[in-house]
């Protein structure tokens, strides 16, 4: 494992668990038919990088095992050394939710990790920011054009006067009107908007731009102070609207500019974990390294969020035993059941996940993807569960229920109070968020070389034996502290690569 494959390209595969009957090819570009491994395995055909090879002969109907779990059944006879293509893998049924073990294997607490801090912005509510941003919230999509024009003016004319303010970020969304505002599920987008407006990186400064006739009243977002609300219909013409927005913004910029970074305990961090453009290496390099870093963060008192219901659902039987109590375990199951029902309403098929890119990277189905995805959660006890759009109010490892969409998940983690996100990718994505730093970790060395000015940390070294999971986990942990302190900038922030917010609205649009 310690060999440098980038120089001599010695053939190598990775078998995760001792009972696995499949392994993935490590070598860049894959390996040709006839390749002989040190164990005597001979490839019966060309196998692409990251794709699975059979370690034993498999008869039709036999279990295909990876991560020590059944990821499918052989649809036909597969000879030892053959490429296990997606078409040869019949997906198993998802775990039944009514008889899962609850809180029966709760990990023992580990010694506290002391002596680590970061330089953050202290807020009046006790939270801390990793950035110092003026966030401007909208109550309805109708005002976006006016706000965008105003933000351009703010950045050009006002922001240079206030060097301690990092940015001005408009919080756009598609909600606010033409929606069933009182439908039961409307609570999800509404509380998401409410919590986004009070994000820790906005320093307690709330500013809401509304139209004046929308269903989502601005008062529901900024309920504490009418001075935080500006209604366009109260103004005589466009110029007056812009002038009022600029004046309202400058009042807040003055206050934000007076803020300075102070030493904060790691317990003030709320770290979101997410993966996008996953591949077969995600579950053996980047995600386990992030999981190791997550354990370090939990030991240091931080809040860590892992998410993506559809990429947890097929591994839920591995999570409910880690719940700190039966109540937390039941909350996990409740979120799975709600999402199962939501998908049935849309007649959605589990086979819709993974994506074509995931499959090209070696993932056969959502079961295999889920088993790799949950590695991000590390090994800590699961101390709580958040519904979509809820704000985190406790420390430790939390499951924040979100869809798997990068953009929806990122938005909901921001609403939970996330002040920095760690994002793993195998295929590569330029994804970023304006409201919080996004630290990107590659699953493969070749991606980190190909996108050297987009990837922050290379976890592909784990696959080649040049670094251990622990090594990269500590690197991620220390980089989180550097980015949170403003000592280091992520590539996404350096280039200004910021995706739009995307609300999760399961309620009807009228």
UniProtKB/Swiss-Prot annotation:
Disulphide linkage map: none
One annotated GO biological process: galactarate catabolic process
Pathway: Carbohydrate acid metabolism; galactarate degradation; D-glycerate from galactarate: step 1/3
Gene3D superfamilies: 2.30.130.110
Cofactor needs: Fe(2+)
Keywords: Iron, Lyase, Metal-binding
InterPro entries listed in its UniProt record: GarD-like, GD_AH_C, GD_AH_second, SAF, UxaA/GarD_SAF, UxaA_altronate/galactarate_dh
Keyword Cell inner membrane among UniProt keywords: no
One GO molecular-function entry: galactarate dehydratase activity
Enzyme class: lyase
Reaction catalyzed: galactarate = 5-dehydro-4-deoxy-D-glucarate + H2O
EC number from the UniProt entry: 4.2.1.42
NCBIfam families: galactar-dH20
Family: Belongs to the UxaA family.
Function: Catalyzes the dehydration of galactarate to form 5-dehydro-4-deoxy-D-glucarate (5-KDG).
Name of the molecule in the record: Probable galactarate dehydratase (L-threo-forming)
The organism of origin for this protein: Bacillus subtilis (strain 168)
Gene name, Swiss-Prot/TrEMBL: garD
């Amino acid at each position: 494992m310690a060999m440098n494959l980038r120089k001599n390209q010695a053939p190598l595969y990775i078998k995760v668990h001792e009972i696995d009957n499949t392994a993935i090819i490590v070598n860049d570009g894959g390996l040709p038919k006839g390749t002989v491994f040190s164990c005597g395995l001979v490839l019966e055909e060309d196998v692409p990088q990251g794709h699975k090879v059979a370690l034993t002969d498999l008869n039709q109907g036999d279990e295909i095992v990876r991560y020590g779990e059944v990821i499918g059944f052989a649809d036909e006879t597969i000879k030892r050394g053959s490429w296990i293509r997606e078409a040869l893998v019949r997906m198993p049924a998802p775990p039944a939710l009514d008889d899962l073990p609850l809180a029966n294997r709760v990990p023992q607490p580990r010694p506290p990790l002391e002596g680590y801090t970061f330089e953050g912005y202290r807020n009046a509510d006790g939270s801390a920011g990793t950035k110092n941003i003026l966030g401007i919230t909208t109550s309805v999509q109708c005002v976006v054009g006016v706000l965008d024009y105003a933000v351009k003016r703010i950045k050009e004319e006002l922001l240079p006067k206030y060097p301690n303010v990092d940015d001005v970020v408009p919080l756009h969304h598609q909600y606010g009107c033409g929606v069933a505002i009182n439908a039961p599920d409307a609570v999800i987008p509404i509380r998401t908007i409410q919590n986004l407006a009070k994000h820790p990186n906005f320093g307690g400064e709330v500013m809401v731009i509304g139209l004046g006739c929308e269903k989502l009243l601005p008062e529901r977002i900024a309920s504490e102070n009418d001075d935080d609300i500006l209604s366009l219909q109260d103004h005589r013409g466009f110029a007056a609207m812009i002038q009022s927005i600029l004046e309202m913004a400058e009042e807040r910029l003055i206050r934000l500019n007076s803020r300075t970074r102070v030493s904060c305990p790691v317990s003030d961090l709320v770290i979101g974990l997410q993966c996008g453009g996953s591949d077969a290496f995600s579950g053996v390099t980047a995600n386990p390294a992030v999981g190791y870093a997550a354990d370090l963060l939990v030991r240091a008192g931080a809040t860590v969020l892992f998410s993506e219901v559809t990429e947890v659902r097929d591994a839920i039987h591995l999570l409910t035993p880690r719940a700190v109590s039966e109540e937390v375990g039941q909350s996990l199951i409740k979120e799975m059941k709600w999402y199962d029902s939501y998908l049935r309403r849309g007649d959605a098929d589990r086979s819709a996940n993974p994506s074509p890119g995931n499959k090209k990277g070696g993932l056969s189905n959502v079961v295999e993807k889920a088993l790799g995805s949950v590695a991000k959660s590390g090994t800590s006890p699961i101390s709580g569960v958040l519904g979509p759009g809820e704000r985190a109010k406790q420390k430790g490892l939390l499951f924040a229920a979100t869809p798997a969409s990068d953009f929806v998940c990122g938005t909901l983690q921001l609403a939970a109070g996330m002040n920095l996100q760690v994002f793993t990718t195998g295929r590569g994505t330029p994804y970023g968020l304006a409201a919080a730093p996004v630290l990107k970790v590659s699953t493969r060395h070749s991606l980190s070389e190909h996108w050297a000015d987009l990837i922050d940390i290379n976890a592909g070294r784990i696959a080649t034996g040049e670094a251990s999971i622990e090594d990269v986990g500590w690197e991620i942990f220390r980089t989180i502290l550097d980015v949170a302190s403003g000592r280091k900038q992520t590539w996404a922030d350096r280039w200004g690569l910021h995706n739009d917010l995307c609300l999760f609205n399961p309620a009807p649009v009228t």
